[in-house]
Structures are given as structure tokens and as C-alpha cells.
Design a protein with these regions (language model features):
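An anionic, glycine-rich sequence signature occurring as long contiguous blocks
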Residues: 3-4, 309-413
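Charged, often Cys/His-bearing segments associated with DNA-binding zinc-finger transcription factors
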Residues: 2-82, 491, 495-496
Length: 507
């Protein structure tokens, strides 16, 4: 295979596979000898079913479905209490389904990862599904999804998000996340994303842009959302808050539209109002290193870690390069995972901004350079890779805190990107509108976030983690849903299981 232009034969391909296996083993042994953790691939097991007979499968299905519903029911008192406060503008004489029952149905729709209103009508109204669901919710009456859509069109859908924040607040109050905190702060990652786009304007709130279409341009209408999630070092990402872009929030006279930074200010205000006393650390991407954002964080008494890109804040970069020569003790080397890391920081950098430089912020800047070894994709050669990460911080760095602030906090900003990707590509249909009524569209979005919120503690719970590891997250949700649409459940067993004491414990 020395000639790159020649196709390898089967023998050479087989030989390369063997070489790659041996090289991989040698690399892992080397990393182990150096005290590095090469990590384990989180692939699902490739084996036949472990159930010996139908009885074993039934027991597993009953246990999984019931424990999933127990976790949901543990949240139900908070959900129902808050949902009951939402004003129902419908005519009471014509109401068949209560508001809270309709919204619980909407949450279940996303807990089971139903992909559309048509699928909800088709799948969630099947007699066997309803019979099984009534084992957990005896009074539930499944409506047509259009009924839910009409309700979402007329109620204050922002109150649905308030339900989500109330449920998160309850978990925080019960100290469910206390073991994952870093320096007793809750890390909130904030990131913007596009929900969907259309070529026609279907609501006046849509943002617009010009896109190329061959030799011409055309107007495209889109919906962007700024999301906030609680993120933790174990990878858990808890949906928290959403802020929609809105054409009316921009300057309509100058046609300067709403943007992510404006949405951040609105979201930050609501987040502070919802959690006024919570110790929060926000982690933000390279769009946010600017004075107004830091002002908002400091006004709210939030810690922050913000990605700093090469061309952002040139005066801060210049100050860093000058001061690092005088602060040679501000260096730290460590191993993390399979990587060698070198940290270098400068504290107390003055950042001047605003009209005539009248405003100033004192910030702290760190650079993390890291190297690691991995196998080349097309050979058995071991390559050395390198990367660099830069952040600015609210608090000064030291050898005692640089690992926590960078590796355990700032890097987990990626958790929200992973969480949004899960909602877009792994069952929650983030990019599906569900309705072309703006209010209803937002309502379905908030219900989706609530459904995701219910599922996250379930897949990290002690009672379900084994089956989640067996089937994967989507496989587990599909396993539960398949159980509920078939005659797997034994009513006396389920009733006894539901009657036992239950406490949510996370791994």
C-alpha cells in the first residue's frame, strides 16, 4: 500500500485491519501506563435478546413502563398545581376536556416521542394504549389533537414554560442535582438555534432574510430560539427556558431585526426573576464576549465563562500577551481523559468599551492547549492531535480552580448543543411546527421541552439505567411505548408497584 494511487487488494485490506487492531491495543496500553483514560466507546451491545421466554420479557416491559410512569407521576403534583393556574378562555358549557388534562396529554405526546399531530391521533387513541394508560392515569380521556391545538391557540402559552421552571425548581429544592454541582453553582448553558424556515410568511412574528436562489435572491422566513439548559459534568442537560425571536422585538422602522443578543437580555431577565436566589454560572459561546453581556451577568450576580475567539476583544488579547510575560507562575499542567493539558492565564485584565471608552470591566482570561494521540482514519499510524480553547471569566483563575472552571464547567457548554441535537434528530421533532398558529407553535414547543424534561431524569435514574444502557435512550423510549400499545401489562402487578414508596434517585 506504499503507492497511494493503487487500490489495495483484499489481503492488504485484511492486513491493515489487523494492524489497526494491534495499534489500538498498543495505544490503550501506552495511555494506561501514562495514567491517561482512553475512554470507552458507548456502543450498544450487539447480541441476541437476553430474554429466555415471554414471561421474562413481560416482567422487563412491565418494570420499565411502570418505573417510567412513576417518575412522571412523581412530577405530576407540581405539574397539575401549576397547570391549574392557567386561565382557560373557552366557553365552560362547551368544554369536554379540562385544560390540565389536555396539557398532560400534550406532555405525554412528547414523552413517547410522537412525531406529529396525525401520529398522535392514530397511535394514542388505540384502545389497548388507552386501557394501559388508564392503569397509571385512571381519569385520562384522550382527545383529538386538534382540540389541543385549538386550546394552545388561545391560552397564555408562556405559562406552560412556567410549569417547566416550577418542576425544575422542585428538583433543585429537593437537592436532586447537588452531587453534580461545581463550587455550589448551577451551570446554565445558553445557545441559539434555528427552529424551522419557510418560503412564505405564515406569521407576522417570523424573522426574514435574503438567500441565494441561483442568480437571484429570495426572501426566507424563519424562527430562531434561544435555549437555556442546566448542564452537569456527567453529561446531563435539563431543559430550562426558551426565548423566541420576534420580528416586533426588533426596530421595524429601520428593519433591524431581533437577534440572539437581544433575546439573551430578555431571557436573562426572566431567568433572574424565576430563580432570584440560585447560584448560577452561565457558559456562553463566542458570540457573547462583550461588555453589555458581562454587565447583565454581573448585575444578576451570576458567575460566567465565555468562549473568546481569536478576533474578539483585540484589546484583551493584547493585554494578555503583555501581562503573561510578567505572570509566569500562572501556568498549570495536568492530564484529563486521554489528553495532556497546559493552562496559561492572566487575571485582572481591564476591558474598556462603550462610547468614548466610558465603561470598563475587569475580566480574567485563560488559554488551554491540549494534545492527545489517536489512530489515523485510513492507516495504523498514531497521530498527535492538538487543540486550543480560550475563555474569559468572571472570577480569577488559580491552580486550584482552573480545572473545575474550564473542564467541568465551560466545556460542558457543549451539553446544550448535544441536547438541542437530541431534540432535533432523536425523537422530539424540534424542527416540526405542529401548527402554523404562532401561539400554538410556541405551546407545542414548550410541551416538547416538558416531555424532554420528564425523560432526562428517567434515563439517568437508578431504577432505569440498566435497561437504558441495554437499549439506548431512543430504544428505551420505544420499548416503553411498544409496551403500552400491546397487552403486556398485568393490572394487579402495576397497581401494587404504583402503591409502593418511590423516590427518584439519579446515578
Amino acid at each position: 500500500m506504499s503507492n497511494p494511487g493503487r487500490r489495495p487488494g483484499n489481503e492488504e485490506i485484511k492486513e491493515l485491519k489487523t494492524e489497526r487492531i494491534e495499534a489500538g491495543k498498543a495505544l490503550r496500553e501506552k495511555q494506561k501506563a501514562e495514567g491517561l483514560d482512553g475512554g470507552v466507546n458507548a456502543a450498544l451491545p450487539n447480541r441476541k435478546s437476553g430474554y429466555e421466554n415471554v414471561k421474562e420479557e413481560q416482567e422487563a416491559r412491565q418494570s420499565a413502563a411502570t418505573d417510567q410512569m412513576r417518575i412522571l407521576k412523581s412530577q405530576l403534583p407540581v405539574l397539575l398545581k401549576r397547570l391549574s393556574k392557567i386561565k382557560d378562555p373557552r366557553n365552560p358549557k362547551k368544554v369536554k376536556h379540562k385544560l390540565d388534562a389536555l396539557l398532560i396529554y400534550g406532555i405525554l405526546m412528547f414523552v413517547f416521542q410522537i412525531s406529529s399531530r396525525r401520529e398522535a391521533n392514530r397511535e394514542m387513541t388505540r384502545p389497548q394504549f388507552i386501557e394501559n394508560l388508564k392503569l397509571f392515569f385512571p381519569k385520562i380521556d384522550i382527545p383529538h389533537n386538534d382540540t389541543l391545538m385549538r386550546l394552545l391557540s388561545v391560552i397564555e402559552v408562556d405559562e406552560i414554560e412556567a410549569v417547566l421552571m416550577e418542576a425544575v425548581h422542585k428538583l433543585i429544592k429537593n437537592k436532586k442535582f447537588s452531587r453534580y454541582l461545581v463550587d455550589n453553582h448551577y451551570t446554565v448553558a445558553i445557545d441559539g438555534t434555528q427552529k424551522f424556515k419557510r418560503d412564505v410568511i405564515w406569521a407576522e412574528e417570523c424573522s426574514q432574510r435574503e438567500v441565494k436562489d441561483g442568480d437571484r435572491t429570495r426572501t426566507q422566513y424563519h424562527v430562531n430560539v434561544l435555549e437555556a439548559n442546566l448542564v452537569f459534568p456527567n453529561g446531563m442537560s435539563i431543559p430550562l427556558m426558551s426565548e423566541f425571536s420576534d420580528y416586533a422585538q426588533g426596530d421595524t422602522e429601520t428593519r433591524k431585526q431581533d437577534c440572539e443578543l437581544k433575546a439573551f437580555k430578555r431571557l436573562a431577565k426572566r431567568l433572574k426573576e424565576a430563580f432570584p436566589r440560585l447560584s448560577i454560572r452561565v457558559v456562553l459561546d463566542g458570540l457573547y464576549p462583550n461588555g453589555p453581556v458581562m454587565e447583565v451577568c454581573r448585575k444578576n450576580r451570576w458567575d460566567f465563562m465565555i468562549v473568546l475567539q481569536n478576533k474578539s476583544l483585540p484589546s484583551v488579547w493584547e493585554e494578555f500577551e503583555g501581562l503573561k510575560k510578567l505572570q509566569t507562575e500562572n501556568r498549570f499542567r495536568r492530564k484529563w481523559g486521554n489528553r495532556h493539558q497546559d493552562f496559561e492565564w492572566v487575571n485582572h485584565i481591564e476591558y474598556v468599551y462603550g462610547p468614548n471608552g466610558r465603561k470598563r470591566q475587569i475580566i480574567h482570561m485563560v488559554i488551554c492547549r491540549e494534545t492527545w494521540e489517536e489512530m489515523a482514519k485510513d492507516s495504523a499510524e498514531i497521530e498527535t492531535k492538538a487543540s486550543r480553547h480560550v475563555w474569559i471569566s468572571h472570577k480569577p483563575f488559580s491552580k486550584e480552580n482552573v480545572h473545575k472552571r474550564c473542564n467541568l464547567c465551560a466545556r460542558h457548554r457543549w451539553n446544550i448543543e448535544s441536547g438541542i441535537l437530541v431534540e432535533k434528530r432523536q425523537g422530539y421533532c424540534y424542527e416540526h411546527a405542529f401548527s402554523y398558529n404562532w401561539n400554538a407553535m410556541k405551546g407545542y414547543h414548550y410541551l416538547m421541552r416538558l416531555g424532554h424534561f420528564i425523560n432526562v431524569p428517567a434515563i439517568y435514574s437508578e431504577c432505569l439505567i440498566d435497561i437504558v444502557r441495554e437499549f439506548g435512550v431512543r430504544g428505551f423510549i420505544r420499548f416503553v411505548r411498544e409496551t403500552l400499545v400491546a397487552p403486556w401489562l398485568n393490572a394487579p402487578w402495576v397497581k401494587e408497584r404504583l402503591g409502593a414508596n418511590f423516590q427518584l434517585r439519579l446515578i
